[in-house]
Structures are given as C-alpha cells and as structure tokens.
C-alpha cells in the first residue's frame, strides 16, 4: 500500500485480513497535513477529514509503516502508529545507468570546452527550472561575486526559465549559460563535466519531516562536490562530507559557499566528490537499498 491519498489502505487491510499477508504502508507525501499547512484547508473540510481518518487507520492497522522521510516517525506515532512499526527507506540510483557513458551533444560539448579553455569554474544545475529549486538566489550570488572566472550552466526547462534568463542578463557579464534538457541517459556524462553541482530548494515547512531528493543522489554519484542549499534535518552532504552546505534562499550564504568551493584546491574538490560517489555506491544503489529493505521485516 502506498500513500497519497491513503484511501487504498481500507482495501489493503481487507485483502491482508483474508489472505494473512502483512500490510506495509509506504508514506512518501505527508497528507493531509500538507493540505492544512500549505493548502490552508480547514481541519474539518470533508476531504481533509476523510484523508485524516485513513491516515489514522493505516497508522493503527499496518504491520509496518515505511517512509523516505526519517523524521516523520513522531508525527505518525501521534496518529496511532506504534514506535516499533516505523522503518526508513531511501531513494537512490540505478547503477547500470552510470556504467555506460554516452557522449553529450556537440553543442553542449562546445560550450563546456569553451568554458574549460577559458579557465572557468563551472557550477552545474541539471533539472527543472522552477521556483522550487531557488535558482534566482544562485544567479544573484554569482552576480554579487562579480567573478569572471565563475560560470553557471543550467540544463533543463521549466516555467521559470525565461525569468531566470532575464535575471541573468541584468549585469553585463557572460557568466550564465542556458541549455535545453537532455535525455536522462546523458545526465551522468554531463554532470561529470562540471566542477560542482548545485542542489537547492526554497523553504518548505514539510521538509521538517526530512527530504529524499533523487537529484542529490545523482549529484553525489557524479563524483563532483555539491553546493547544497536545502533546509531539512537530514543532510547527506554534511553526513558524507561531499560538498558545502549553506542556508537556503540566502544570496550571502550562497556567495560564501561558492567562494569556498572555488578557492579549494582541485585535490580538495576531488576528495569531496569522491566521498559522495563512494557513499552512493555503499548505501544508495537500488540493489543495496532492495537488500536493506528486505532485511527490515
């Protein structure tokens, strides 16, 4: 059984009762509290009430509750889950996707070669160009640094892309490059052409339960240091010493983080990047995660 919006727990409970199977409920999204806090819906809204009853039911009746969010435990206990029912799982990477290294398109290769020939320090962002990832702060931080040796390469699309291009053009410096999205199979090769990778997010109260971003594991696997700007209690960048972690939505903090990575020696950056890659290989391949998951029960 999986979360959002929890109503399938009732059917799952009946099936398990008849078959004698164990009921394992996975929580990925925090419903209905997200509706209350971010959607500003009322506690006794009929839909919210319906989902809350379902959440209380799986907390009480599931044999185990599994979540990607390690800090959701106390919340779920308050809704009827026994302490010993909670298990934590994780997202990760498909190792086979990183074994093949397809070449990147010629126009992308041309841009990156040009930046490398000019001695640029390349910050990469690979993903959707939306407000969720706090990209305006990254652009403003680089502009404030006013350093011609730093370039940011954005690869992807999204509803904020034109706004970001406009912001990037406000200062007369050619630090920012916006490229179209590429197939997922090319992401590993492209990521490894950067000097560091940006992973950020705007503040979100729901992050207090923890966060598990696929983008972070891909970035760690690239072997490049990470500029990490996410406000969540679990922080793999700090845990595995694979980059620099800064306050999110802060131009000043991002400036400091960029400067710290830029002024490091290549050996220091290489060590950070390899720390992240090794952590993924040891803990976050889906083969390893599947074995760990099976051992939980």
Specify the residue positions occupied by each region the protein language model found.
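A short, well-ordered alpha-helix in the C-terminal region of glycosyltransferases
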Residues: 253, 260, 267-282, 295
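Carbohydrate-associated surface elements
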Residues: 71, 89-92
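Membrane-proximal helix-turn-helix segments that form the acceptor-binding/catalytic region
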Residues: 7-22, 32-33, 45-67
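Nucleotide-activated donor-binding/catalytic signature segment of Leloir-type glycosyltransferases, i.e.
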Residues: 150-155, 162-189
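Conserved donor-binding/catalytic core segment of Leloir-type glycosyltransferases
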Residues: 112, 116-142, 153
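Nucleotide-sugar-dependent
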Residues: 133, 183-190, 197-220, 227-238
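A short helix/loop element that forms part of the nucleotide-sugar donor recognition site in Leloir-type
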Residues: 99-116, 267
